[in-house]
Amino acid sequence: MRDALSVYRSLVARGAAPALTWYGGDGRIELSGRVAANHLAKICGYLLDEIWLTPGQALHLDLPAHWKQVLWGLGGLLAGATVTCRGDAAPSASGYATEGAGCASGIDARRGSADGDSAGGQAPACVLVTDGPDSRAAQAAQDVLALDLGPLAMAWSGPALPAGVHDAAAEVMGSPDDLADETAHEASNAARWQASASR
């Protein structure tokens, strides 16, 4: 079975050869193995070092099908996240993935406790990556990362971001170019994604 780390290593090994090609409404995008691996390392480092994502914590991608969704999903798996997407399983009150709809179910369940304690322990909240930082899902998440889907966007280009919302495209650029933690991925739900893809 290929886990997120083996995908990352394969991308590094591809070097300048094409690794990801995307055709969308904004044209054609092609990333080399080196560039894709660089994105994954930066996303992983950002989630671990700046957002403080914990092993197995829910990372919900409230994004349409897009090449940036692919990179953030793989970067999240490298960071050890339980990655879910629009219309997929969602974080529960414990912050870990169960059936549901986005971050809302987990956050709403925790609101009954003033300190966020759930099921006898401190619950890690959902981290949300979204192209709609003013959405209902964004209101329910603890950490909201606004992602501009423009092909060359280096920062959020939409309306001013609400207080506390991170500009994911801009902030991730300060993270290391190489993967610093090669063990974090072990806590991810990569096996579930692999099983779904093979059906």
Stretches with model-predicted labels:
Residues 1-18, 28-30, 44, 48-53, ...:
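Extreme N-terminal leader/targeting regions
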Residues 1-2, 24-26, 35, 68:
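Long terminal accessory regions outside catalytic cores
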Residues 5, 41, 67-70:
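Residue-level marker for well-ordered alpha-helical positions
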Residues 8-31, 170-199:
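AMP-dependent adenylate-forming
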Residues 19-21, 55-65, 128-130, 199:
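Short hydrophobic beta-strand segments
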Residues 21, 35-46:
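Conserved N-terminal alpha-helix of the aminotransferase class I/II PLP-enzyme fold
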Residues 46-86, 108-110:
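Conserved AMP-binding/adenylate-forming
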Residues 73, 83-139, 150-166, 171:
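Conserved ATP-dependent adenylate/AMP-binding module captured primarily in the ANL superfamily
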